Amino acid sequence: MNHFQLHQVITTPLPVKNDIEILVFKTNLTDTKRIGDIESLLDIHPHIIQWNVDLNDCDNVLRIVSRNVAAQEVENILLNAGYYCEELQ
């Protein structure tokens, strides 16, 4: 006679960060030409919902509304395009 023992496995789902967050960066995006240089890079990112640059701010602030985007990732995108970018705390 075969005896089978059933085991119930209880799993807890891994936490998924679905919260929308706003990231703010100091940049050297000082004019519309420079902003145009990075526009397509930010527009095609699947987790960046919205972004803008405040040219009237002394830090030329880049503001990104996103889901699951690390600040370092944004900094690298701009650095690879030849621009300065540092997260503001």
Give residue spans per PLM region.
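Terminal low-complexity, intrinsically disordered regions
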Residues: 1-12, 17
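Short amphipathic beta-strand starts and helix->beta connectors
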Residues: 6-11, 43-50
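Short glycine-/aliphatic-rich beta-strand segments at the starts of folded cytosolic domains
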Residues: 12-29
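Short beta-strand-to-loop capping motifs
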Residues: 27-29, 63-68
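Short amphipathic alpha-helix segments
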Residues: 28-46
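Short Gly/Ser/Thr- and Asp/Glu-enriched loop/turn motifs at secondary-structure junctions
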Residues: 55-59
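C-terminal structural segments of small proteins and small subunits
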Residues: 67-88
